Amino acid sequence: MKKIIALTLLLCMVFALTSMTAYAAEDIGDTLVLYSTMTEKDLDALISGFNEVYPDCEIEVVSGTIGETTSRIAAEADNPQGDVTWGGLADSDGMQYAELFEEWVSDESANAIEGYSTPNGIYSMDHLSTVVFAINTELEKELGLDIRSYADLLDPKLEGKIIFSNPNSSSAAWNNLCNIMSVFGNDSEESWDYIEKLMKNLVISDSSSNCFKLVEQGEYVVGLTYEDGAIKLIEQGADDHFTMRYPADGASASAFGMAVIKNCKHPEAAKALVNWVCSAEGCSYIAQYLKTLRMTNKDTVYGESLLPATEDIKWVVRDVPYLTEHKAEILDHWNDLLLEVQG
């Protein structure tokens, strides 16, 4: 009996180790070029976790906004310099960037939370990004404000004191614009009436990270941004003058993902990276490393997290198919209105 028990335990250990290193069985090469919109700490999490499984594969990172990275991929189409991209590819993109990427998704997409699997057969979705207001609480107090809702952003005291990125090139800005439309009614008169009023207080930045960094530094009172960026500053000790708040009217999230660049030089390594990130093992590693990111794999183990529990946030339903189908028209309307309001 003791021998049987010992053998059973040994087999269980072998199975567990095999499962944890399932992606390490293949030779994927020693080089991988990653284009990414993610933060430095996000990249640290991905690289350190991936290299535990594939220690011989060196990842070179090229960072930029989604507009910059996709433009670069398009310009390099005849001789691709990148292999895979992470971040900025949103579930509302539709087929906008389809010609840039391989028609391939990770098998792990089948394990995504319902509603957050691949939207187009090209993106493998790995994490969620929820909209928040980044607020400099010292400046807010000086102005005598208590900023909680979208209506609060229209206060004349905030003219030129709200920073927002460009929704034409920033997925974070598009995410926030989608949330406004989810609250006020998609491409409705009420939505555009609100947006026109909001534009009077906005300063548009080329960088989505400025929408939390420059708020924390005191250059702006409010930034319309995303929780995983803002929470990192709080984690680093900025909570004595900086906070993030979910819109009292309701918050929603975009799913963001990865895609393999068409005709890339290292497809095996690119697919191995996507598979690992989207797996329960990869999602759990990144979530526990960062403590600031919500992942898509339904089997993610979070451990300690700095983010509030899902049930503590007021959520609003986002009509992703509608926003995807009408994205070009919405952006055209945004551009025309911004020119009219700000000149």
Where do the protein language model's features map onto the residues?
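A ligand-binding cleft/hinge motif common to bilobed small-molecule-binding domains
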Residues: 91-96, 221-241, 290
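Conserved C-terminal helix/tail region of periplasmic/extracytoplasmic solute-binding proteins
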Residues: 316-343
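Periplasmic-binding protein-like
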Residues: 110-111, 129, 193-198, 204, ...
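Mature extracytoplasmic/periplasmic domains
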Residues: 252, 256, 261-318
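Bacterial N-terminal signal peptides
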Residues: 8-16
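Sec-dependent signal peptide cleavage junction
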Residues: 15-27
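Extracytoplasmic ligand-binding site segments that recognize negatively charged/polar headgroups
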Residues: 33-44, 67, 80-219
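Conserved N-terminal structural module of periplasmic/extracytoplasmic solute-binding proteins
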Residues: 6, 25-84
